[in-house]
Amino acid sequence: MLSNSDSKHGQKAYWCVVSGSDLWLVDGQLPLATSNELNLVAEKAQKIGSYNNHPVMWLNEADVEQSLEMHSLRECLHFPEPLFLLMSKAIQYGHMTQTMRFCPQCGGRNHLNHNQLAMQCGECRTLHYPRIFPCIIVAVRKQQHILLAQHPRHRSGMYTVIAGFVEVGETLEQCVAREVKEETGIEVTNIRYFGSQPWAFPSSMMMAFLADYHAGELKPDYSELADAKWFTSDNLPPVAPTGTIARALIEQTLLNMRSDS
C-alpha cells in the first residue's frame, strides 16, 4: 500500500479510482500523479500492480471527498492492454468490497485484507476472494459465413458472437455447444480454444473459442437475442469494438475465411 510518506517523497502513481464499472479519467487518461497532487488519501489506497515503472493504485470513489468525473471502463478499450487489465482488476476489487460486506458462512462483517486482497470475516476469519464467473464466447463459421447475433441491450445495432455462462458440471466445450444450440438452434463441431480476457462487467472471465457449423437451421431464441444471421466478409454489420475478445474472434474468423477462399 502506498503510504503518505511515499507521496511526500514525490512518488507518482497511476490512480484507478472506481465506482461500479466506472473509473476516474482526466482528459481521457488515467491520472498519473502523487496522492497529494490529486488530493487523495493514500492510506485508503491499495497497490494492485505496476505500469511503466509506476505503481498502479486502486481506490474506491466512496473514499474520495471531491467530486470526480467518472467514465465507463468500456471507454478505455483502446488503452494499452497491460494498463487496461490493471484497470479491470481495480474495478473487480471495488466490486468485491461493495458486494461482499458480510460473511456468507456466519454473517459477520467483512473487511479488506490488504495482504491477501480478499474480504475477511471479523468473526470467523474466513477469507472471501473476488468472485470470478466463467463464460464462453465463440465465433461460429459456416464455409464463407460467420454467425453474428444482436442482443436487445445493443441499441447501436452492434452484432457480436455468441456468449454465455458456464453451468455447474459442464466442460467449456460442452458449454460452447449448449449455448450455441440454445440461442441459435444450430449444432457446432471442431471446437477449439482461442484465448481469454478478463471482463469486469462486473467479474467475468471470457474464454474464447472457434467452432464450425455442423447441423441445424438457424432459429434465434428471441427471448435472448434480438437477431442472429450468417454474414459474409463483405456485408458485415457494426461489430464489437477493437480491444474486446469478441472483435478478435471475428477478425480471426474473417482471416481464416480469406485464407480458405
Swiss-Prot record:
It catalyses: a 5'-end NAD(+)-phospho-ribonucleoside in mRNA + H2O = a 5'-end phospho-adenosine-phospho-ribonucleoside in mRNA + beta-nicotinamide D-ribonucleotide + 2 H(+); NAD(+) + H2O = beta-nicotinamide D-ribonucleotide + AMP + 2 H(+); NADH + H2O = reduced beta-nicotinamide D-ribonucleotide + AMP + 2 H(+). Belongs to the Nudix hydrolase family. NudC subfamily. Residues 130-253 form the Nudix hydrolase domain. mRNA decapping enzyme that specifically removes the nicotinamide adenine dinucleotide (NAD) cap from a subset of mRNAs by hydrolyzing the diphosphate linkage to produce nicotinamide mononucleotide (NMN) and 5' monophosphate mRNA. The NAD-cap is present at the 5'-end of some mRNAs and stabilizes RNA against 5'-processing. Has preference for mRNAs with a 5'-end purine. Catalyzes the hydrolysis of a broad range of dinucleotide pyrophosphates. Substrate binds at residues 74, 129, 197-204, 246. Pfam families: NUDIX (PF00293), Zn_ribbon_NUD (PF09297). A divalent metal cation 2 binds at residue 179. Zn(2+) binds at residues 103, 106, 121, 124. InterPro entries: NAD-cap_RNA_hydrolase_NudC, NudC-like_C, Nudix_hydrolase, NUDIX_hydrolase-like_dom_sf, NUDIX_hydrolase_CS, NUDIX_hydrolase_dom, RNA_Hydrolase_NudC, Znr_NADH_PPase. The keyword Transmembrane helix does not apply. Disulfide bonds: none annotated. Keywords: Hydrolase, Magnesium, Manganese, Metal-binding, NAD, Zinc. Homodimer. One of its GO terms (biological process) is NADH metabolic process. A divalent metal cation 1 binds at residues 163, 183, 224. Its cofactor is Mg(2+); Mn(2+); Zn(2+). This is NAD-capped RNA hydrolase NudC. It comes from Vibrio vulnificus (strain CMCP6). Divalent metal cations. Mg(2+) or Mn(2+). Binds 1 zinc ion per subunit. Its EC number is 3.6.1.-, 3.6.1.22. A motif (Nudix box) lies at residues 164-185. It is an enzyme of class 3 (hydrolase). Coiled coil: none annotated.
